[in-house]
């Protein structure tokens, strides 16, 4: 029972329990469903408890083992795709804390336990489009699965960010997407056939995971079976017929990088805006796929005892990406800002942002900017990043105002 004064949340809406009357009888609370108290997704009716397993008066949080938690809503600007994950936000916060405290602070990634064998992947995969459309395509096969409900910690982690748990495989891919920012997809091997093809679609219809029917065009990138049947709209949404279910015993787990413009056009034409397309449309770093793939595989192996990776890792990566090369002139930076920032601070800020100083020639610094920072490709972008971490509040305001005035009477 939610008593008077309790604040309940249903999706993005919240309401406070107040004293009221129902059919002339005073009400001092409300019986709740799972979704209303945040312990599940069932909203069909009130929760029925076993009277023999619980003592009246026990707090619901204690009975369900719900610990205190906080959900932070972060408003990410469109150019900061690197921050569209928990790790991305933590990495940026670490750079700020390094500058503020003077001690090196680093965002840490979990240890990976999955280790594919040396050799080839047992599932044939062919990439039939230019590297510009699909810069990288990786995947591995996992067999011996018993797909069921995810453990409580994983279900709660997804529910707290507004996602509905599906099954352990799908939940892991969604978890890693939000943890690391790299979309993943799992195909039921029994529905794939003799292999996978990354290709442009034919003029055909496809039933998607949300049960909607999309009309594909020859400009849409898809992952198809060996006979050409589309299984997934690349970077947007998987197909209903190839997804994992409780009957799935083996999967092909995919982590890929798709062209931002291609994904954007396809998603818009199909009227879809998914967590996957949201990230691909803004440009992802192909170097990030391996960690995400092995992280998801590690979790699946941990949560599905008896499962194992079969064979090696498939990796189509014909043109490996390089860091952005930027030359920073410190004198230019000081003129642009209107104040000198100590070189020691500049070096520390760049290091905290994982921007490598590859060479110094006096005031000219050669930089290697990580590919995941798609918004930092020019000297002015680097200056903006340095100033953002250094602190705008530390820049003194000039007492002078510079303006160009037109002569009297000029138009």
Give the predicted meaning of each segment.
Residues 1-411:
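RNA/tRNA-interacting regions in translation and RNA-turnover enzymes
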